């Protein structure tokens, strides 16, 4: 093999490696979805200035819960955040970089950002509540921002969920 063939092969291998390393939405789902949702809230003026993006992100973070709230904490979007790598998100967003690429950059700075995962949703129409653990029943109520005062046993939680089910379950046709 001559030198030019080796160079071509090397370039090909590097290109394949870069494609394989590219982050996918499933690899970093909370980051990608949160960045996309946040970017969709920005107006054209804000999108061009990374300082305005940072201010808007801090305001956005005040309304977030659960995994998104943790994501904001990792980035430095909350007052109680220990570290701040907010500019690693705001500057690329101001350049109109896609969410997947932004999250790829963030992952290089802090790997735990991509460790955040959404929990699997329980399909209430097809699940037997009696087979779930009390912890899962409590989680269902917590996700609905409901409480079960006086619930001590599993049957109490099931009864409360059955009462609230029509209010929260979506019937798909």
From Swiss-Prot:
Main localization of the protein described in the UniProt heading: secreted
Keywords: Developmental protein, Disulfide bond, Secreted, Signal
Pfam families (UniProt xref): ARMET_C (PF10208), ARMET_N (PF20145)
Gene3D superfamilies cross-referenced by the UniProt entry: SAP domain (1.10.720.30), Saposin-like (1.10.225.10)
Signal peptide residues on this chain, from the entry's feature table: 1-22
GO biological process: dopamine metabolic process; dopaminergic neuron differentiation; neuron cellular homeostasis; neuron projection development; synaptic transmission, dopaminergic
Disulfide bridge positions per record: 28-114, 31-103, 61-72, 148-151
Localisation: Secreted
GO cellular component, one term: synapse
InterPro entries to which the protein is assigned, alphabetical: ARMET-like, ARMET_C, ARMET_N, EF_Hand_1_Ca_BS, SAP_dom_sf
Job description of the protein: Required during the maturation of the embryonic nervous system for maintenance of neuronal and cuticular connectivity. Essential for maintenance of dopaminergic neurons and dopamine levels.
Family: Belongs to the ARMET family.
Record protein name field: Mesencephalic astrocyte-derived neurotrophic factor homolog
Gene: Manf
């Amino acid at each position: 093999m001559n030198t030019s063939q080796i160079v071509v092969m090397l370039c090909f291998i590097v290109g394949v490696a870069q494609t394989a390393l590219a982050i996918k939405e499933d690899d970093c789902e909370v980051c990608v979805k949160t960045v996309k949702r946040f970017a969709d809230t920005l107006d054209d003026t804000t999108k061009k200035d990374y300082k305005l993006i940072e201010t808007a992100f801090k305001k956005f973070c005040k309304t977030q819960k659960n995994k998104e709230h943790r994501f904001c904490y990792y980035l430095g979007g909350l007052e109680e955040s220990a570290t701040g790598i907010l500019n690693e998100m705001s500057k690329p967003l101001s350049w109109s970089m896609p969410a997947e690429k932004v999250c790829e950059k963030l992952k290089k700075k802090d790997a735990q950002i991509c460790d955040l995962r959404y929990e699997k949703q329980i399909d209430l129409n097809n699940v037997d509540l009696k087979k779930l653990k009390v912890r899962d029943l409590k989680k269902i109520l917590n996700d609905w921002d409901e409480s079960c005062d006086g619930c001590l046993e599993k049957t109490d939680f099931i009864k409360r969920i059955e009462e609230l089910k029509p209010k929260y379950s979506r019937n798909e046709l």
